[in-house]
Amino acid sequence: MGTRGLALALLAAVLLLQTVLPAASEAEGLVRIALKKRPIDRNSRVATGLSGGEEQPLLSGANPLRSEEEGDIVALKNYMNAQYFGEIGVGTPPQKFTVIFDTGSSNLWVPSAKCYFSIACYLHSRYKAGASSTYKKNGKPAAIQYGTGSIAGYFSEDSVTVGDLVVKDQEFIEATKEPGITFLVAKFDGILGLGFKEISVGKAVPVWYKMIEQGLVSDPVFSFWLNRHVDEGEGGEIIFGGMDPKHYVGEHTYVPVTQKGYWQFDMGDVLVGGKSTGFCAGGCAAIADSGTSLLAGPTAIITEINEKIGAAGVVSQECKTIVSQYGQQILDLLLAETQPKKICSQVGLCTFDGTRGVSAGIRSVVDDEPVKSNGLRADPMCSACEMAVVWMQNQLAQNKTQDLILDYVNQLCNRLPSPMGESAVDCGSLGSMPDIEFTIGGKKFALKPEEYILKVGEGAAAQCISGFTAMDIPPPRGPLWILGDVFMGPYHTVFDYGKLRIGFAKAA
């Protein structure tokens, strides 16, 4: 072959490679982790276990999204219904683990080979320090309390492989105790937190920070695409270093991070069927949390949503007592333009001006002793009063008569979310259910019934549950919404660490 022939052959080879390989500008700095999705499983989900006719004390009982101390949001997390997982490696050579990539926490932990007395450890992959040439001993004790379980162990250091990246000298927790059923039935081995270092247990530097420090990503941005259209197989993708335009439609709406720790931002009004609930008209805090499968919000609003979608609820005797004994008095105070947050204290149902005397105990679960609080469950009459004020205020804004308002609030007393965290709905009624809209960055983000109703099982045995669950965070951190996978599925989500902002766009 002559020189010209060789040149032509090389040119043809280059052109062929360009057709089969992505352009360097597209692939450079982007690390893709495929996510697997599993359907919600009747055996592992938290069942309601209650019929709509049962009377329950308001906010009492075993709510899986609430810790005994009413403490940090991490301590409220419920991984029982987790659906999206990815694979990482720890050590050299890499030992494989399936993890939840969780923007609502900041630590990496995996089961340890030295976990001898927890059955959960024997059902999952376990880290063997002696099998890794890059292991470094640390030994500092660590523990994390979640809403539906806990882990304890100690810190170690090793290389962590995420996609094609190798993060060196990463601190992580070797879990030697995994009590309870949560991690026993879990389909994942551990959790990789993508929150801020401010909430990291033991002040360990999160994996994401190490990626940036070691120059492993070109841009300090990661993004989530959760595929909600499949039951199994391709569940989506998390991309470190940027985003893939194929995963979203249009432009992202960005909002600034308002408080580092969680990916927290300010959210505006919540609308049900196009009508304001009034609860967040003046603004609410929200966090984008990939480690939460449902969408959690204040009980007062979740109850209104339940009523509109026909979700089975539980009857609250405290709520009904408020309506019958204090309803007219509350209405009169609202009509007299009394400051709403002061009403429940004026009628003698709350200790302070609309607060419950709860400590500001929303904090990181680090090395401190748990913060004790008299919390929401200690004063159900105060909680019921505060909800009634919200409901009545909203109805007055719609110019409803006093009789209609009292009747409506009494109906809501029959629709309170189950203490077990889930509410069943009629699978055949999706067509009559309203859209639920969240105002973010001045734009409305709607969830359609088929997006917020989750189907469990198939055929005649199928059940449908609401994707909304109640969770009350007291001031100063709350009221707070947690936008989990129910929201992040329909909306591609960008976590921009460099500019401290979060972006949402319609998922492709």
Curated annotation (Swiss-Prot):
Gene Ontology cellular-component terms listed: vacuole
Tissues expressing the protein: Embryo and leaf.
Domain annotation Saposin B-type: ranges: 314-419
One of the record's GO molecular function terms: aspartic-type endopeptidase activity
Domain Peptidase A1, first and last residues per copy: 84-505
EC class (word): hydrolase
Database matches in InterPro entries: Aspartic_peptidase_A1, Aspartic_peptidase_AS, PEPTIDASE_A1, Peptidase_aspartic_dom_sf, Phytepsin, SapB_1, SapB_2, Saposin-like
Annotated signal sequence range: 1-27
Catalyzed reactions per annotation: Prefers hydrophobic residues Phe, Val, Ile, Leu, and Ala at P1 and P1', but also cleaves -Phe-|-Asp- and -Asp-|-Asp- bonds in 2S albumin from plant seeds
Domain of life, per lineage: Eukaryota
Annotated EC: 3.4.23.40
Residue ranges of the propeptide: 28-66
Annotated positions for site Cleavage: 377-378, 421-422
Active site location: 102, 289
Family per similarity comment: Belongs to the peptidase A1 family.
Functional summary from the UniProt entry: Involved in the breakdown of propeptides of storage proteins in protein-storage vacuoles.
Protein name: Phytepsin
Organism: Hordeum vulgare
Upper lineage: Eukaryota, Viridiplantae, Streptophyta, Embryophyta, Tracheophyta
